[in-house]
Amino acid sequence: MSYRPYQQIERRKSRQIHVGKVAVGGDAPISVQTMTNTLTTDAEATIAQIRRAELAGVDIVRVSCPDQESTIALKEIVREVNVPIVADIHFHYRRAIEAAEAGAACLRINPGNIGSAERVREVVKAARDHGCAIRIGVNAGSLERHLLEKYGEPNPDALVESALEHAKILQDHDFHEFKISVKASDVFLAVAAYQQLAEVCDHPLHIGITEAGGRRTGTVKSAIGLGNLLWAGVGDTMRVSLSAEPEEEVHVGWEILKGLGLRHRGVKIISCPSCARQGFNVIETVAALEERLAHIQTPLTLSIIGCVVNGPGEALMTDIGLTGGGGGRHMIYNAGKTDHTIAADGMVDHIVTLVEEKAARIVEEEAAAKAAAEQAAQEAALQHETV
């Protein structure tokens, strides 16, 4: 692909922290998060749900810990999954300490509702002792009373002031491994608050539109809000909040990042909405391909266009392309060039095979290049030693 300046996004410069093995902020990739909706005390169900999210590509998972039974179960959950776990804590400072001891990689708290300064000190000590990061989670629906009285309602100034007050509490304890979120269900409020916060601090930001709604409504609201922020370079880690299964949140989060070219994973399908000119059933073909190609993680682009109006042009910019043609024959493109024609029968199977083979070649080539680079580095090191 050619270099296109209009596609470049300059990300906000932020401090880098670590949530377990995942770097957040700085030049680290924007991580995708979700949250379980099982009872945390049901460790088996929670682990199964996290594993489904892992298959979808999640980087970090948040788990609610409302009681001691949950923090007890958390230890098993952390042990059995492959991604860092954030323990969601409200009000009960002991739960935060227990979660840190259980192996949580991050504690999601509001220092202001944990209790006395002594309790905050104990939580910070537990986080430091166990290598936990902290997420300061400000939400328009649970702002402190004094800020509501000061501003009259949740607004960007109130959210940012709350976030900075909480950040100062941690900084006063010489704790700096934290990220901040200022979420709201209103897209305008959330975006404005994040933009304002991004201008006054360099802490990594967890972005999200809270209580966004069901699958369709929540996806649209999140795409508008998060897409706006990410396009402006704001955001180091993100969650799409949906009234849906966690893996669906992960899928949508990845699609937002892929749409902006910020991360790449799996097959990106470019397809037309179809019309009377289509040479094959585009909608059914795309649905089948999305399902059949979901297992591929190697970044690839695939165009599925029903006719020759836009098909050849789209195929120029994709790894593999399909354009509907006449007489029941359709053109397959490889790397933007015409390659061969195919009939509708068996077309989906054929494209799946082409994509799988190309993905396998890319993996092999990348592995070979990595091995060659490592070999060259070893030889250079040996040569340096003999000089």
From Swiss-Prot:
<dbReference type="GO" id="GO:0051539">
    <property type="term" value="F:4 iron, 4 sulfur cluster binding"/>
</dbReference>
<keyword id="KW-0004">4Fe-4S</keyword>
<dbReference type="GO" id="GO:0016114">
    <property type="term" value="P:terpenoid biosynthetic process"/>
</dbReference>
<dbReference type="InterPro" id="IPR016425">
    <property type="entry name" value="IspG_bac"/>
</dbReference>
<protein>
    <recommendedName>
        <fullName>4-hydroxy-3-methylbut-2-en-1-yl diphosphate synthase (flavodoxin)</fullName>
        <ecNumber>1.17.7.3</ecNumber>
    </recommendedName>
</protein>
<dbReference type="GO" id="GO:0141197">
    <property type="term" value="F:4-hydroxy-3-methylbut-2-enyl-diphosphate synthase activity (flavodoxin)"/>
</dbReference>
<keyword id="KW-0479">Metal-binding</keyword>
<dbReference type="Pfam" id="PF04551">
    <property type="entry name" value="GcpE"/>
</dbReference>
<dbReference type="GO" id="GO:0005506">
    <property type="term" value="F:iron ion binding"/>
</dbReference>
<keyword id="KW-0560">Oxidoreductase</keyword>
<feature type="binding site">
    <location>
        <position position="314"/>
    </location>
    <ligand>
        <name>[4Fe-4S] cluster</name>
    </ligand>
</feature>
<dbReference type="InterPro" id="IPR011005">
    <property type="entry name" value="Dihydropteroate_synth-like_sf"/>
</dbReference>
<feature type="binding site">
    <location>
        <position position="272"/>
    </location>
    <ligand>
        <name>[4Fe-4S] cluster</name>
    </ligand>
</feature>
<dbReference type="InterPro" id="IPR004588">
    <property type="entry name" value="IspG_bac-typ"/>
</dbReference>
<keyword id="KW-0411">Iron-sulfur</keyword>
<feature type="binding site">
    <location>
        <position position="307"/>
    </location>
    <ligand>
        <name>[4Fe-4S] cluster</name>
    </ligand>
</feature>
<feature type="binding site">
    <location>
        <position position="275"/>
    </location>
    <ligand>
        <name>[4Fe-4S] cluster</name>
    </ligand>
</feature>
<keyword id="KW-0408">Iron</keyword>
<dbReference type="GO" id="GO:0019288">
    <property type="term" value="P:isopentenyl diphosphate biosynthetic process, methylerythritol 4-phosphate pathway"/>
</dbReference>
<dbReference type="InterPro" id="IPR045854">
    <property type="entry name" value="NO2/SO3_Rdtase_4Fe4S_sf"/>
</dbReference>
<comment type="function">
    <text>Converts 2C-methyl-D-erythritol 2,4-cyclodiphosphate (ME-2,4cPP) into 1-hydroxy-2-methyl-2-(E)-butenyl 4-diphosphate.</text>
</comment>
<comment type="pathway">
    <text>Isoprenoid biosynthesis; isopentenyl diphosphate biosynthesis via DXP pathway; isopentenyl diphosphate from 1-deoxy-D-xylulose 5-phosphate: step 5/6.</text>
</comment>
<comment type="similarity">
    <text>Belongs to the IspG family.</text>
</comment>
<keyword id="KW-0414">Isoprene biosynthesis</keyword>
<dbReference type="GO" id="GO:0046429">
    <property type="term" value="F:4-hydroxy-3-methylbut-2-en-1-yl diphosphate synthase activity (ferredoxin)"/>
</dbReference>
